[in-house]
Amino acid sequence: MVDPLCNYNVLESIFSYLELNDLNRCSQVCKSWYHFLNDENSDVWRWHCLRKLPKEAVKSDLLSSVTTYKTKLRAYLHAWSPNDCSRNVYVKPNGFTLHRNPVAQSTDAARGKIGFRHGRHAWEVIWEGPLGTVAVIGISTKEAALQCHGYVALLGSDDQSWGWNLVENHLLHNGDTQGSYPLLNNAPKYQVGERIRVILDCDDNTLSFEKNYEFLGVAFRGLPDKKLYPTVSAVYGNTEVSMVYLGTPLDG
């Protein structure tokens, strides 16, 4: 009779050296392998997490909302793309935070590595430096511009992007202000360091936001059937913005 512990150790050793796409296929082979890989804090996920994530990120307070090795790894794979941002922006070594260089008369944006066309998705955005005159968070397609001259609300300036300007509490799309947001009397302004949760529902074609665990309402409806990416645009020199992908949002 084979010792179950022996089987466990063998699987652990094999799965630790597979690529992530292969792990997904393995989880569909049988119930035993599914349950094995369903443990998000197992040594397999720990191994993959520590191998891919920068050391400074794994135990950072930035990832306090993603508590397992698997969800930390997933957040990293969805973080800002160093290849899909303005030339005046770079992604810091932690992999989750972008830094805007102090370039005069420029507005600069960045997109996440992975876009969404189906399902429901949530991520947190944390503005960790001054907002400046314009600071916009939201979504865009691949066609939306990532840099322009002047200090403007770049995200939301065309029909390929949708944004919330945190400075003025305005919604922006197609170059127009779509109204105030949230719809509250004397709505409080964003404070640097607050976590804003962005909720994209590709099934219902809506974009919503939460702040301090309070749902602020639906911001945009009728989103197109296109792949949409987490996006921000900034104007302030040396400001920094972090993004942490959370997965499917919890209702209630």
From Swiss-Prot:
Pathway the protein takes part in: Protein modification; protein ubiquitination
Domain F-box: 1-48
Protein name: F-box/SPRY domain-containing protein 1
BP GO annotations: negative regulation of gene expression; negative regulation of synaptic assembly at neuromuscular junction; neuromuscular synaptic transmission; positive regulation of protein catabolic process; proteasome-mediated ubiquitin-dependent protein catabolic process; protein ubiquitination; synapse assembly involved in innervation
B30.2/SPRY domain residues: 58-250
Pfam families xrefs: F-box-like, SPRY
SUPFAM superfamilies linked: Concanavalin A-like lectins/glucanases, F-box domain
Native source organism of the sequence: Drosophila grimshawi
Superkingdom of origin organism: Eukaryota
Transmembrane segments: none
Assigned GO CC terms: cell cortex; neuromuscular junction; nucleus; pole plasm; SCF ubiquitin ligase complex
Cellular localization per UniProt: Synapse
The UniProt record lists the keyword Oxidoreductase: no
Function of the molecule: Required in the presynaptic motoneuron to down-regulate the levels of wnd and restrain synaptic terminal growth at the neuromuscular junction (NMJ).
Assembly with partners or alone: Component of an E3 ubiquitin ligase complex composed of hiw and Fsn.
InterPro entries, sorted: B30.2/SPRY, B30.2/SPRY_sf, ConA-like_dom_sf, F-box-like_dom_sf, F-box_dom, FBXO45-Fsn/SPSB_families, SPRY_dom, SPRY_FBXO45
Family, similarity comment: Belongs to the FBXO45/Fsn family.
Main location: other
Entry keywords, A to Z: Neurogenesis, Synapse, Ubl conjugation pathway
